Each structure stands twice: as structure tokens, then as C-alpha cells.
Amino acid sequence: MATYVQTNVGLYWGGYSLASSFNAIALHLSNSPQDDTVYGDTTVSNASGLSTVTLEAEGFWQSTTDAVLQASLGSNEVISVTPVDQSAGSPSIFSKYTTSSYNPIAKGEVGSMMGFSLSAEGRGEKSVSGEILVIPATYTTSSESSTNASIGAVSATQSVYSALHVTAASGTLDVIVESAPSNWSGEATRITHTQFTAVGAEMKSAAGAITDAYWRVKWTVSGGGSFDFISSLGII
């Protein structure tokens, strides 16, 4: 199993790419077990409780990043972290969060960099460990699709999740997620994202069972415009 040194982490916060302002990101996944021990048990028993997703991060203050983070306080955002790089097939961890705290001047001493810190809490969605299908770039072609990816089937107890971050917009953008039983024929549309005409983000899902193992993202740019976006897919 490969290990990585953090040098090219990506952070997509709603409709913004903010990694260049950050120098530390931590994701915490937990569960709140509930004691269900009864007479006759010889050891403590716990039932699975509610799951929790938390993001904590810090970095160096910049006015443009500060404006985004202040506006997001108390609001819901789709956040994706790409812990290795932003290549197709690289890991992407995403979920919906509510920004619970933002400290624009978390630390600052004479002669040192002015730093900020923040925390965000999960907004009713599990954390999805997926992979990047569409790399962050500028797309102008009227209709394109990502390289087909063998991500696997979706069982009856699972769902497939798609995270889309649009960081620059001109015209209209329509994005769908397709699956196919082979590489590539017999495709079916599984997820249809809301049409984008401005920067923003969206996380959508489709419930299983889906027996297809191959997946791709397909998009159409209309109105003579161009869009910068990144798209990730995961199954949990």
C-alpha cells in the first residue's frame, strides 16, 4: 500500500478551489455508540449510533479566501479533499458540511504569518471515499465525457455519490453520470446534476442495486461559454 507526503492536497469548498491558502486539513469520522447492555451480558455491549463527520483546517489569511469562508459560516457546502493530487483516478473524499466556526485571526505574533482556523460539521451525509473522474481544468467543447472508470457495482444497501464543483462559469453546463455493464456499451444515466450557469457545487446520489461496474461523467457546455470544474464519484 502506497503512502504519501502531503504536497499537492486539493480543497474544493463549494464553488471555490482554496488549497493555496491552507497548510493543514484534518478529517474526523466517528460513531456515537449507545449502551445496550442487558441482564445476562458479561461484557458491556454497544449498538451503533449516529455517525459524525468533522473537518478541521488552518492556513494563512488571504482576503479572497477570507471572503469565501466568512460567507460560508453557518451555511451548507459540498467540500471535497483530494489528499494526493488532482489526477484522474486519484482519491477524493467528499461530503456535505455546515461551517461551524471560523477564526480569521487564529494566531499571529510579531514577525510571523497571520493564520486562520476553521471547523465544519457533517450535514446529514456520510463521508464518501471516491475517486476523481474529471480533473480540474477549463472545458469549452460542447459535449465531452471522462475516461471510463471501473469503480464497481452498487449493492442493494449502497448508493453511488457524485460531487461536482464548478469554479468558473460562462454559459450553461449540464452534467450526468452514466454506468455501463461493459467498457463501453449499454450505458444508462444514473445521476443528473442541476444545470449550472454560475460557480457552485452539488452532491447527488442514486440508490442501488446497480450491477454495472463501469462509470463515467458526461457533460455539455452550451451558450458558447466555458467552465472550470472537477467531478468525483464514490460508492458507499
Question: How would you name each of these model-derived features?
Answer:
Residues 1-58, 62, 90-121, 126-131, ...:
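Solvent-exposed edge beta-strands and adjacent loop segments
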Residues 9-11, 76-89:
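Short conserved beta-strand and strand-loop elements enriched in small hydrophobics
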Residues 113-115, 157-162, 208-228:
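Noncatalytic modules at the cell exterior or secretory-pathway interfaces
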Residues 116, 129-131, 223-236:
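Edge beta-strands of jelly-roll/beta-sandwich modules across compartments, strongly enriched
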Residues 147-158, 166-168, 205-210:
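Extracellular and analogous surface-interaction loops
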Residues 188-198:
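Solvent-exposed serine/threonine-rich low-complexity stretches and specific carbohydrate-binding patches
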